[in-house]
Amino acid sequence: MGVVLITVVTVVDRHKALPNSSIDVDGHLWEFLSRQCFVLASEPLGIPIVVRSADLYRFSSSLLTLPKACRPIVRTRGATAIALDRNGVVYHEDRMGVSIEWLSVLSGYNHLNSSLIINQPYHLWVLGAADLCKPVFDLIPGPKRMVYAEIADEFHKSWQPPFVCGKLFETIPWTTVEHNHPLKLRAAGGEDTVVGECGFSKHSSNSLVRPPTVKRVIYAVVDPARLREIPAPGRPLPRRRPSEGGDARPEAALARSRARSVHGRRRDAAPPRGPAGARRPPGGRRDVDGTPTLGSVRPDIHTLKGRGLSPVPHLALWVEQWFLALQKPRLYTHHRLALHNIPSILKGEKREDTFEDNRRDELRHDDSRHRRHRGLPLRARSPPQCQPAPPRLGPHLRRSRGRGGRQLQRRGGAERRA
């Protein structure tokens, strides 16, 4: 089944920008977010896979309790980096063999969607800065959930996402709720809506303490492909700004769309329909008066007479087939025989075309073509009402029977015709 949901856990500054690397953020804030991620990973939305930056090893003690296969890491600063001192804080990385290593989040995402592992639904959690989260928004399609802590400071080096956190997508502030409902949001009216709540109440032993530098914790659902807000359940769809592709005056846009639809109907009027109850034959086209056009369908005259309809207006269809038979007589032999049968059909008689009739007509055609080539007079055709006589072959042709059946063979034996 693969990855069914992606949740990004990160930090943003007052400009809604992400830090370039994990070392640009205080370690206590990463510890707070890692515990938030550990709490949320218990929701029943698939097998949790929490991937983080390798330099957050010291601040991810709560995530180390997960199975080794569920807590991979990505070494964003290279394979040789082990520790980095920043403002007196040492950011240690995982030692070799402590955790499963991915080359990137994209490679791990493709691995979870491949057939190399068990086919199960996976919920991918991404904990880190822009060096880890940026490929998730740029290279992995589809909407994603975001959980980020907003601080009042400003990062020296940052990355501004194209969807601008908190501006183009609706955000929901997180508050603490009862410990038996860790993933629900307490609405203003007293009703609970399942959208994603984090934290425990003061009665819980694992209460989470928010760092003083954090203004608020935000939950949002973003889709960089659409670049518009996705409202929470029960909330109306917000109006888009002109910079986002919306209209400054929605009433004027609605009036213009109505005017275009009215003018379009006047300019492109629908063609008049046939009489009520008239059914269009399958695969056929109708003329202005409702009759099938030439070449559209080949109606059955017996069916028309059985329904009380006159077959005479449809004789033009057989006339057209007659001209086609003159151009390609071998392919349209059955149409020519059907044209010969018209007089008997109109009299109420029913005559079926047989294999002998088709074969006799082919032999007559071969003899006529040969006489035209030799300059000999053509033989007269028999009337269509009676049974046509078998054609007489010229003196230079003889009838022979071989393994392939009846054949026309020259006496010299140089040429054969099937």
UniProtKB/Swiss-Prot annotation:
Residues 241-250, 353-369 have a biased composition (Basic and acidic residues). Residues 257-266, 395-404 have a biased composition (Basic residues). Coiled coil: none annotated. It comes from the Viruses. Residues 230-304, 353-418 are annotated as: Disordered. InterPro entries: Herpes_US2_varicellovirus. Belongs to the herpesviridae US2 family. This is Gene 68 protein.
